[in-house]
Every structure is written in C-alpha cells, then in structure tokens.
Design a protein with these regions (language model features):
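Glycine-rich, basic loop-to-helix element that forms the pyrophosphate-binding segment
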Residues: 63-79
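Conserved nucleotide-sugar donor-binding catalytic segment
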Residues: 142-224
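Short, acidic, metal-binding catalytic loop of nucleotide-sugar glycosyltransferases
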Residues: 21-30
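Conserved donor NDP-sugar-binding/catalytic core segment of glycosyltransferases
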Residues: 98-129
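Acidic donor-binding/catalytic loop of UDP-sugar-dependent glycosyltransferases
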Residues: 43, 91-104
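Membrane-interface aromatic/basic loop that binds lipid-linked glycans or pyrophosphate carriers
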Residues: 271-329
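Short aromatic/hydrophobic "clamp" motif used to bind/position activated sugar donors
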Residues: 84
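A conserved acidic beta->alpha catalytic loop
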Residues: 22, 37-46, 64
C-alpha cells in the first residue's frame, strides 16, 4: 500500500462527509483512510462507521478523548502505507491532488517529505489565500525552515511523509500547536532524544490542500498556555539554528534577513503573550539573539530596530497601547 491517510475526528459532523468525499473521489486509490474518532459525542462516530461499511479502504478507530496529538499517534501506529499524510476532518483536498503528489514522489523516490500548496479559506466568506511553492529540493533543514518561512506554516497536513520518519518521532500529547513542536524534529532541525534525522525535503506546486478556518478551533481560541507552546517551539528552533551557525561569517550573511524575519515572528508571539497576561517573559532568548546578530550585520526589520532602541518592556507596553487604540476605531 502506498499511502495511509490519517484523519483525527472530533465534533465535526457537519464537515466530515465533505472531507471524506473529497478523498474517496480522487483518481488515485492505493490508500487506506484511518479515521480516529477521538471520543466525539455528536454524530461523528455514526458517520465514520457508515463510510467504513461503504468502502473497505476506510478503517475506524473509536477511542476516549485524548486530543489531536494522541489521535494522530494512534493513527500512525495502525498505518500500513509506505507514506503517511494527515487531513483534518473539517478540511478537504482538491480534485486530482493525490495522484499529482504521489506522481511527484514516484518521480523523486528519495523524497522523505513533500510539501504541497494550501488554499486557506478564512471563515464562511469568499476570502481566500493560496500558499504556493516552487519545485525545490532541500537537504538542509535550516534552508528549508528559513527560506520557505516554514515557521509560518508548520502544518502537519499538506505534507506527505515516509512512514519510517515516525518510527521514533511522535506528536506531543496534551499540547496545542503540536505541529510547531513536531515538524522541527521531522525535518532534522532539532534532535529527537539526541539524534537528528536527515530527510530529503521537497516542495511542489501541484495538488492543493483546502484548509478552512474554524472559529471554534484551537488556533482561533488560543490560550496563554497554547501561545506559550508556540513561543517555546519557535525558541527551541531559533536556538538550534543559532548554535549551528555559530560565528561563521558566511552563514550569518546568508541567513541575515531570513533570521530577522523569524526573530520578528517570535517577538510577535512574545508581545501577544504580554497582551494576554500583562507579564513579561524572563530573559527571552530571542532578545539576546537579536542583539548578537546586530553586532555582525545591520538590523533591517523595523520592529527589531525599535526593540533595540526602546527595549523589550517598553515595546510590550507600546504594542498593547497601539492594539487598544486600533480596536476602538
């Protein structure tokens, strides 16, 4: 079997049928669908069982609620495919996507991770954004992370993985923003229990994952603890990158601007944490790394320059004030 499609299911009775139909209508059919019902109390269990009776490629696991990571890990343990992909039960994939991405993997059999485009649909309105890629092969995790700005789309879905990658790597149970805490290990940016994987990573412009913003979902209702997971995951990745770059002038110059953009992303999460709690984080590593980078290259990103001028605490207060004034308009 070529592909295992793992779909965690939890209280998505209104969208689950369209999700499954978008897969079952694909021209490529060498796959299994593993539906992991994570203790849903709506009609999802019935829907899962009905699809399983209609098509023997659909397998169902009913379990007690353990969260998204636990559901994915459960599916991985049951997967039989050479490759694994994840689809959320409130999303769909475009017609022809599976045949296109599998054809790409057959053409480049050394590929361990293939990332393909995403159509991001915001709410129920017509607003859409296409996350697209060029045909590029990466054998360096830092290049992939910074040049593709992966930190902005650390999605478990919209990727095809060799199943072997998950022999020693799993999703962290009980934590939201779990993708940010997992993707860096899968791409070899961070060591998992002391060992790095060294995958061949490819991006492609074929196929399309259709993501729908869920107003009741984790991202839309993130708590301080959730955002801290995001901050912590990105901070670990930044520290790993800075450790690998060290004082190598060529690498500092190569990654100068892309590092600043990544640091700005982390700083924005820090500012959000302050807005939620009114508390400053104790000696955030990103502040130190901005200062260190500024000794070697010119800081070009405005927010980082402002950070160096007025300091972290003042920037937190200023950001909160600006947001308060903006919301009054």
């Amino acid at each position: 079997m070529k592909l295992s499609i793992i779909i965690p299911v939890y209280h998505t009775q209104d969208t689950l049928p369209s999700c499954l139909d978008s897969i079952l209508q694909q021209s490529f059919n060498d796959y299994e669908i593993i539906l992991v019902d994570d203790g849903s109390t709506d009609d999802c269990p019935k829907i899962c069982d009905a699809y399983s009776r209609q098509d023997d490629r659909v397998k169902v696991i009913h379990k007690e609620n353990g969260g998204l990571s636990d559901a994915r890990n459960t599916g991985i343990l049951q997967a039989k495919g050479e490759y694994i992909t994840f689809i959320d039960s409130d999303d769909t994939i475009a017609e022809g996507t599976l045949s296109l991405v599998i054809e790409k993997i057959i053409t480049y059999p050394e590929t361990d991770i293939l990332e393909y485009p995403v159509m991001e649909r915001l709410g129920n309105g017509p607003k859409e954004h296409l996350l697209s890629f060029k045909e590029i092969e990466y054998q360096n995790a830092i290049d992939y992370w910074l040049e593709e700005k992966v930190y902005n789309h650390t999605y478990a879905w919209n990727k095809i993985y060799k199943r072997a990658l998950f022999e020693h790597i799993c999703f962290p149970k009980g934590k939201n923003f779990e993708d940010v805490l997992t993707i860096p290990y899968l791409i070899g940016l961070l060591p998992y229990h002391g060992s790095f994987v060294t995958p061949n990573i490819r991006t492609t412009n074929v196929g399309c994952y259709e993501y729908r913003w869920n107003a009741k979902g984790i991202t839309a209702n993130a708590t301080y603890k959730d955002l801290y997971n995001l901050y912590d995951g990105h901070t670990q990745s930044l520290q790993a990158i800075m450790n690998k770059i060290g004082s190598q002038e060529g690498l500092i110059l190569k990654y100068s601007l892309s590092l600043q953009e990544f640091m700005t992303q982390i700083l924005n999460v820090l500012l959000d944490l302050y807005e939620l709690s009114g508390k400053y984080e104790n000696n955030p590593p990103v502040i130190h790394h901005v200062e260190k980078l500024g000794k070697s290259v010119k800081i070009k990103v405005f927010k980082l320059r402002l950070l160096n001028i007025i300091g972290y605490h003042n920037l937190c207060r200023l950001n909160k004030l600006v947001h308060r004034l903006y919301r009054r308009k």
